[in-house]
């Protein structure tokens, strides 16, 4: 999918995460609401498309560095949102948790 086109798919994924984020291990404490994780899901979604064909383990350190300048970033740290970024990445790349999409 071309860069200008893949962002259109974010609406569908955002709805999925809005509905399902609270079932994920990093969100199960209930300390943060969806708005805390939403930028991380979007970042994972966009990054999976931007780095299509790359392996998460090969790109994670770059994603961590780039998170600090991501345009939709909140004040969250990489460690706080890494799980959400990875979930969104996995959903896009087909390495989804059971029961998704």
Where do the protein language model's features map onto the residues?
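Intrinsically disordered, low-complexity, hydrophilic segments
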Residues: 1-101
């Amino acid at each position: 999918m071309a860069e200008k086109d893949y962002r259109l798919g974010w609406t569908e994924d955002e709805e999925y995460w809005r509905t399902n984020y609270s079932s994920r291990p990093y969100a199960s404490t209930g300390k943060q609401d969806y708005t805390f994780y939403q930028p991380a899901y979007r970042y994972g979604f966009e990054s999976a498309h931007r780095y299509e064909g790359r392996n998460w383990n090969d790109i994670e350190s770059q994603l961590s560095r780039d998170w600090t300048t991501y345009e939709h970033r909140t004040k969250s740290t990489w460690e706080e949102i890494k799980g959400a970024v990875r979930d969104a990445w996995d959903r896009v790349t087909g390495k989804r948790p059971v029961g998704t999409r």
